[in-house]
C-alpha cells in the first residue's frame, strides 16, 4: 500500500509526480529544486542559497511524512557543474550528523529542470 505525501510547505510539483510516496515504512521523495514554496519563484542567488532552499524543501517533505533528516538512508544529488560540489556539500552537511549521514552519490548532469544548478532526492525509513 502506498500513501502520497503532500505539503504546502514544499513546492507544488511541476509535472505529473508526487512530492513523495510512503510505502510501508519507506519514504521515496521526488527531486527537489530551489523553488520557493510560497511564491513559486526560483531561488538562484548563489549556489549556497540555492542548495539551502532545496534542503528546506526536502525538510518540509520529510516532516509531512513524520520524519527528519535522521531518517534519511540515501541521498541522490544532481548538479550541473561539478565545480559547485564543495559549496553544495558544505550546505548539505549542515543538515546531517556526520556520524549517521546517509549513503549518497553526487552526479554532474548536462541539464536540470528549469535550468537550476542542483536537484536532490532522498529515501528515508521510519
Model-derived regions, located:
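Short, polar/acidic, helix-capping and beta-turn segments at strand->helix junctions
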Residues: 2-126
Amino acid at each position: 500500500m502506498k500513501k502520497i505525501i503532500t505539503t504546502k510547505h514544499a513546492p507544488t510539483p511541476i509535472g505529473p509526480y508526487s512530492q513523495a510516496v510512503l510505502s510501508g515504512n519507506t519514504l521515496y521523495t521526488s527531486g527537489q529544486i530551489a523553488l520557493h514554496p510560497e511564491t513559486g519563484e526560483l531561488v538562484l542567488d548563489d549556489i549556497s542559497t540555492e542548495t539551502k532552499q532545496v534542503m528546506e524543501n526536502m525538510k518540509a517533505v520529510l516532516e509531512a511524512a513524520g520524519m527528519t533528516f535522521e531518517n534519511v538512508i540515501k541521498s541522490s544529488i544532481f548538479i550541473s557543474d561539478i565545480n559547485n560540489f564543495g559549496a553544495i556539500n558544505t550546505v548539505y552537511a549542515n543538515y546531517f550528523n556526520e556520524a549517521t549521514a546517509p549513503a549518497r552519490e553526487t552526479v554532474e548532469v548536462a541539464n536540470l529542470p528549469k535550468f537550476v544548478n542542483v536537484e536532490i532526492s532522498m529515501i528515508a525509513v521510519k
